[in-house]
Amino acid sequence: MSLLINIDVPDAEIGERFYTAAFGLTVGRRFGKGFVELLGWESPVYLLAKNAGTVGAGGDLRRYERHWTPFHLDVVVGDVDAAVARAVAAGATLEAAAKDTPYGRIAMLADPFGHGFCLLQFSAKGYDALLGA
């Protein structure tokens, strides 16, 4: 199996500018207007232009204001503070400043379309730090 990351956005050009500036991703292929592949992570990212108010799934309408969802991306970085500065400069909203945890340093943000994500810098032990003695 493999993983693809599809992100609905109301404007693919704005999405492309954000994701390339915030994360250093590069454009792979363009599949017509409003559908672009971004490369640079272990899995490709596909930005799909979908208008707000259109049906997403199960009758739920797409909305691009900030919303909570139990599913989000954690982007693992080498320097969380530098990554936060880069993402915010590109248009992200910082929702929770970077904090230290047993497994590393983590900050919570949202992209310009309301999709939440975390920036995570693992400690030497990473999630193994959460295992019992």
Regions found by a protein language model. Name each.
Residues 1-4, 25-74, 84-110, 121-133:
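Vicinal oxygen chelate
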Residues 9-11:
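Conserved beta-strand-loop-alpha-helix junction that forms the acyl-donor binding cleft
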Residues 14, 80-84:
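Short, conserved charged micro-motifs
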Residues 15-20, 87, 114:
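Conserved active-site tyrosine of GNAT-family acetyltransferases
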Residues 77:
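Residues forming the ATP-binding cleft of Hanks-type serine/threonine protein kinase domains
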Residues 116-119:
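Short glycine-/small-residue motifs
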